[in-house]
Design a protein with these regions (language model features):
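Short, acidic, Ser/Thr-enriched surface-loop or helix-capping motifs
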Residues: 48, 70, 86
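Beta-rich, blade/repeat-based domains predominating
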Residues: 1, 11-32, 57-74, 78-79, ...
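Short loop/turn segments immediately following beta-strands, especially the blade-tip
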Residues: 5, 44-52, 126-133
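Short loop/turn segments immediately following the C-termini of beta-strands
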Residues: 37, 47, 80, 109, ...
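Short, solvent-exposed loop/turn segments at conserved positions within beta-propeller repeat blades
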Residues: 35-40, 77
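Structural signal for beta-propeller blades
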Residues: 1-2, 40-43, 82-83, 122-124
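Surface-exposed loop/turn elements that mediate protein-protein interactions on large endomembrane-trafficking
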Residues: 2-9, 94
Length: 133
């Protein structure tokens, strides 16, 4: 897991133990979720003041291409389809999409629109909220 920035910035490796890709945004002290497709696991960690990850723990026994967290704290993992977990790591649902997702993120004015990037299309799904799809 790497930190990157503008061309005049320097990047550094967050973790030597994670094999993951996809974009996440986080500030120091914030909890993040990263997915390892090769291990088929999703991890939770806290971003330190220097950008390193600490308190690394398995969040879900499913990895994937991308992870996104909604405004209610539910965690979405893209792995062939979208698997949805509550903040405690319990799977609460699935979202089927017409093609394999390669990246997901939340947007919209209330952060309740899940944007799903496939190989040939961009999809948008409205989510309801805490522990609901």
């Amino acid at each position: 897991v790497f930190q990157q920035g503008p061309p005049d910035s320097s990047g550094w490796r967050f973790s030597d133990s994670l094999d993951t890709y996809g974009f996440i945004s986080a500030a120091p002290g914030q909890r993040v979720h990263v997915s390892s497709a090769s291990e088929d696991r999703t991890y939770s960690a806290v971003v330190g003041a220097d950008g390193t990850l600490s308190e690394l723990a398995i969040f879900a026994e499913r990895g994937g291409e991308s992870v996104a967290v909604d405004a209610s704290g539910n965690v979405y993992v893209a792995n062939g389809q979208i698997f949805v977990y509550n903040a405690g790591g319990k799977q609460i649902g699935e979202i089927d999409v017409p093609e394999r997702p390669i990246d997901i993120l939340f947007g919209g004015p209330d952060r309740r629109t899940l944007f799903i990037l496939g190989h040939h299309a961009l999809f948008a799904v409205e989510v309801r909220g805490k522990d609901k799809l």
